[in-house]
Amino acid sequence: PQPRARSAGYDNIAYHSLDMCEDFYRDMREKAATITDRNVYGMMLGDVVHENMSLYTDYLEGLKTLGFPMFNILGNHDNDYTASNDTDGRRKFEQHLGPTYYSFNLGRQHYVVLDNLIMKLDSNSQLRDYDQGLTEEVWQWLQNDLMYVDRSTTIMLAAHSPMFMGINMAERSNNTQNHRSDYAALFSKYSKVHAWAGHAHTTFNYVYPESSNLKNIEVHTVARSTGELWTNEYAINGTPRGYTVVEVDGDDISWYFKPTLYQRNGFTGKTSPQPEYKHRDYDFDDDGVARLRRDGSALTESYQMKVYKPGQYNNTYDEMIAGNATNKYVYVNVFLWDDKWEKPKYNGTTMTKVGYKDAYSLSAYEINNHYYTYGYKLAGGNEYGPGGGNIHTIFRAYE
């Protein structure tokens, strides 16, 4: 969720992250209450706070409302940036939430939680820079832990930063991740590994091909649950604020996107007017409940894609920025799509996947561009600007 204090300058562009956290917790609590045929557990994939150690108290208060246990992963922003080294930086996390690497068994699966960010001082002598991968201590522990796990066991691996394929389709290597070849070889020995991560602020699922020595590994990178980092609005991959629900039945695992239903606290008023939300499919009623424009029904997990009619979505991100035109293609963003899914169809025709370097979220662009147009400033005087690319879930078909 990565919340800041409500008084933080970078938390006042649109919506307060702590407010969005409250809505997020309420949604998870209500969703969990509907699940009566199995136990419910949660996993936060890091950055449970944003460099403000006092917010651990708020986070713990939020967890108390959920009604189910939460397992936590250390993110880079969970470290105390006033500390002088990696060990001291994680002390506050450990005091409030426990160890930064551990394992446990649930059902037939073995869960492994790793700290894969090695914090170091930046040019301002603050603990905000980092190397990625495993320290010797964590690597030795991991080998010892898996020594007792049968190779037929499904492994659920969780770390803050992606440990395998990245959102830019660049494979992690020993140059970017300490002990990468070591842990890849170790996990490749198991029948199935699901590698979960956050950090990248966008959604990315990747399935290694049968020709790969990592063909047993599926990569799941999830976006920030409270939305885009600075505005706490739509996430940059084109989803509303929300989270991933993972259903486990023995060794079978499935998942879907769950949009957060609520937005109960108001706009900060830093810009006027608010974005038009021309490409959003829902609005919030007076009670802060998201309702679909098409029929007024509540926003539920049935909302798994965003469709753009012909003329709305330009062929590439660069064309869209330039304001160039229209085309006769229908575009769709299928939120958590991966290569094990079928490609979507339009009027019986299989849609073509748009290259990730060209794909973007028009819904997110409209919102971000609004704040950019109003000249909102971030740290260092940089303007808040739109972003695009690295979206792997956009398809199109000719109308």
Give the predicted meaning of each segment.
Residues 212-337, 394-399:
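Binuclear metal-dependent phosphoesterase catalytic core
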Residues 1-56:
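N-terminal active-site segment of His-dependent metallophosphoesterases
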Residues 40-42, 155, 193:
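Conserved acidic residues
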Residues 10-17, 45-51, 125-135, 167-174:
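The substrate-binding groove and active-site-proximal loops of carbohydrate-active enzymes
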Residues 1, 46-47, 75-76, 160, ...:
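Active-site glycine-centered loops adjacent to acidic/histidine catalytic or metal-binding residues
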Residues 53-149, 174, 178-194, 202-257:
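Extended active-site neighborhood of metal-dependent phosphoesterases/phosphodiesterases
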Residues 2-4, 92-171, 260, 269-282, ...:
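Conserved catalytic scaffold of divalent metal-dependent phosphoesterases
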Residues 303-399:
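Long, low-complexity serine/threonine/glycine- and acidic-rich segments characteristic of extracellular
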